[in-house]
């Protein structure tokens, strides 16, 4: 009887091992499937995107993805790209293929900064927004960032003419008044939850415009930093990405 019992045990063990093996294979297949699902898809100039040099990715209030490139504007609906380029025979189109930055205003219109102007997309028509310097003279300048502020204004960051503002219903863009008017070469800005404006100059120096307009030029702990980017989390903490000192909190 003992040999028979041993055979039953061996068969039982084989069934158990087979079951475990099948279970492990099933888990492996699920894991592999999840890994495949998480794998990114590359879009470049050989695959739908108009240029390999992309400067910003922006998602609008309807969920569409807008991509600024050095060869036109790309719009992605989750399935396909639509590319908009400068049309020399179309006065209502892009006036440049050199798109630097994107945001959306209070009315839901897309706002673009190019290498020489500020544009607003009204339906299918691009409108050029006149940019006026501190003497109210028209200028053409390199727009490096567009950002919607808490009051609905669009802050327009330029290289050479400082920070400008475009009010929702205004037909032009004007130099931001106050102490910040003396700042000309701006790299990046961030308006925090307290409505203070953090300003990174092109040389990496960090400044802050208080809500009352006062400009703070010495921010403790940042004097020696070469700041490249700035972000704020949901708790209000400010993070600085620096050139040689890592991330500063």
List each language-model region with its residue ranges.
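Carboxylate-rich, polar loop motifs that coordinate divalent cations or form catalytic acidic clusters
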Residues: 1-249
